[in-house]
Curated annotation (Swiss-Prot):
Organism (species): Polaromonas sp. (strain JS666 / ATCC BAA-500)
Protein name per the record: Glutamate-1-semialdehyde 2,1-aminomutase
Alphabetical list of PANTHER family matching this protein: GLUTAMATE-1-SEMIALDEHYDE 2,1-AMINOMUTASE, GLUTAMATE-1-SEMIALDEHYDE 2,1-AMINOMUTASE 1, CHLOROPLASTIC-RELATED
InterPro entries tied to this protein: 4pyrrol_synth_GluAld_NH2Trfase, Aminotrans_3, PyrdxlP-dep_Trfase, PyrdxlP-dep_Trfase_major, PyrdxlP-dep_Trfase_small
Chief location: cytoplasm
TM stretches of this protein: none
HAMAP family: HemL_aminotrans_3
Amino acid sequence: MEPQNIKPHTPELSRNTALFERAKKLIPGGVNSPVRAFKAVGGTPRFVQRAQGAYFWDADDQRYIDYIGSWGPMILGHGHPAVLASVQKALLDGFSYGAPTEREVELAEELVRLVPSLEMVRLVSSGTEAAMSAIRLARGATGRSKIIKFEGCYHGHADALLVKAGSGLATFGNPTSAGVPPEVVQHTLVLEYNHLAQLEEAFALHGSAIACLMIEPIAGNMNFVRASIPFMQRCRELCTQYGALLVFDEVMTGFRVALGGAQSVYAKSIPGFKPDMTVLGKVIGGGMPLAAFGGTRAVMEQLAPLGPVYQAGTLSGNPVATACGLATLREIQKPGFYEALGERTRGLVAGLTQAANKAGVPFCGDSEGGMFGFFLLGQLPQNYATVMTTDGPAFNRFFHAMLASGVYYAPALYEAGFVSSAHSAADIEATVDAAAKFFAGA
């Protein structure tokens, strides 16, 4: 639906500014998640008052084409009629029970049916909770303590995962946040993404002690960096060889890049490819607080109440969240959904690239399904160190120019973007036109 009575964008941000000042007095940094504060790009955060389709309106009634989509969940756009109807119906039956519901079973059935590697799942309330629980389960199932993660991959803010690489190859990591004791991360080995030699050495040195290797198959907190096919294949082979579990963090990519997640994309190039465990979130909740982790029956049956690995949650499987998630999953299974979504997203990236190239501005981008990223670089990076070479001040200028044109990208250089089925060809054209004007004057 095309909104009517759109106000022109103006530099005045009276209500946004006032709300931010009020918030800073009571909420640390004025926000409830750091990236929202615009600290990386400067300026005043936009306080959203409503959203519909591909758009949101801020507190000053300025409209924006939204390429964040709640950081990925809104694959259908905001306020999709079928999802809204499902949530409204669920609300009439009660908000939360602390007891099992039929919708929990239905959602689990859908997830297991759609993701071939899943035999059982456990529902939780956030991606952080899912990743944290998956690691605990991997350790419990294998009887091992050490885990592998990769520099630049984000798996939530659990203590054991807030870690950066140590001082040498195949050394254990150091905390990236105050409040995380060094001993908490002493079992976390941090490797360079897409670095085969480091991967080989880590398993050669520690293979018998490694419980799991956790990886974002497409790293969305490096903007958009794919694990190469040879690298992913070797991850699978080494985990199998040493008895470690391969854990796919698909909180961002699950149902966002393909119906079966990123693992289904890799399975096209690696015959029989499956992770042992998968972490899901975002799209499966349709914008509600809902996530999941799952895997083989043998591993998942180690969870309480069947097994010795404890995990619990008061709001896990919330009836309103599961209604929202089920409605979303049903919509994205309609014929042609991902073909159209992928085509629209590729069109956006191609348009931005062409506009930058025409102006002689270094630029490259990539996408899969409804997820995309771009860099002010000459070629796509393969690891975090290369991502860090992107021109930060230039990105900040781009961000604010697009914002002034009514286009809302992530207010940080290292975050992926998202296209929804609600984005129209006109939205993409308007976005590319705004970018072309910026690049021409850069």
